[in-house]
Amino acid sequence: MFSRVFVRSMAASAKAGVKPPVQLFGLDGTYATALFTAASKTTSVEAAASSLNALKETVAKDTKLTSILENPALSAEDRNIVVDTLSKKINLDQSVQNLLKVLAENNRLSLLEHVTSQFSKLTDAYHGLVQATVTTAQPLDSKLFKRVEKALAASSLVGKGKSLKLENVVKPEIQGGLIVEVSDRTVDLSIASRINKLNQVLREAI
């Protein structure tokens, strides 16, 4: 459940007609969407994103802090102390402070990393940036990466007036070819996929 202070922030944002650019699913997506809506009204999406990034960097540099956030046995009092300490140390945006309080209240501080990742999807969409990944068996060289990037940017998968944010993910198990994922669409051109399809056809023929 969300805390009352966060609910009030979301309600105020909803009245202003602020609508998240994309729909997210899962508990982390719900929290990220609530933060986006609240930040749009109370401060700004950019301020919340900046605070989340600063928070992410702080946690990444401190393995002890990471362990604390992921510890479900932490008492409610200790969780609140952690949140207060982080808020003061980083000077967090108010909407992000409220988010941390909600996560602490519900013993879900371990979701912070996932919420941050989901929030990035919202801010990218908000700024007209389309996230995409191209998965290959080996890293793409810069020339081939740019060719794939250019082709995707001009395709209907991205759309006019939008920018592309492409990432190359390496998975040797696909054996060759590539898998392109843009938003919720996937184009699987991997060798592994072709082999699976061939095996399926052979099984059906027997």
UniProtKB/Swiss-Prot annotation:
Q: How does it assemble?
A: F-type ATPases have 2 components, CF(1) - the catalytic core - and CF(0) - the membrane proton channel. CF(1) has five subunits: alpha(3), beta(3), gamma(1), delta(1), epsilon(1). CF(0) has three main subunits: a, b and c.
The subcellular localization recorded is: Mitochondrion; Mitochondrion inner membrane
Phylogenetic classification of the source organism: Eukaryota, Fungi, Dikarya, Ascomycota, Saccharomycotina
Task: Give the matching HAMAP family.
Answer: ATP_synth_delta_bact
What are the GO cellular component annotations? mitochondrial inner membrane
Give the protein's recorded name: ATP synthase subunit 5, mitochondrial
Function, as annotated: Mitochondrial membrane ATP synthase (F(1)F(0) ATP synthase or Complex V) produces ATP from ADP in the presence of a proton gradient across the membrane which is generated by electron transport complexes of the respiratory chain. F-type ATPases consist of two structural domains, F(1) - containing the extramembraneous catalytic core and F(0) - containing the membrane proton channel, linked together by a central stalk and a peripheral stalk. During catalysis, ATP synthesis in the catalytic domain of F(1) is coupled via a rotary mechanism of the central stalk subunits to proton translocation.
Q: Which family does it belong to?
A: Belongs to the ATPase delta chain family.
**Which keywords fit this entry according to its UniProt record?**
ATP synthesis, Hydrogen ion transport, Ion transport, Membrane, Mitochondrion, Mitochondrion inner membrane, Transit peptide, Transport
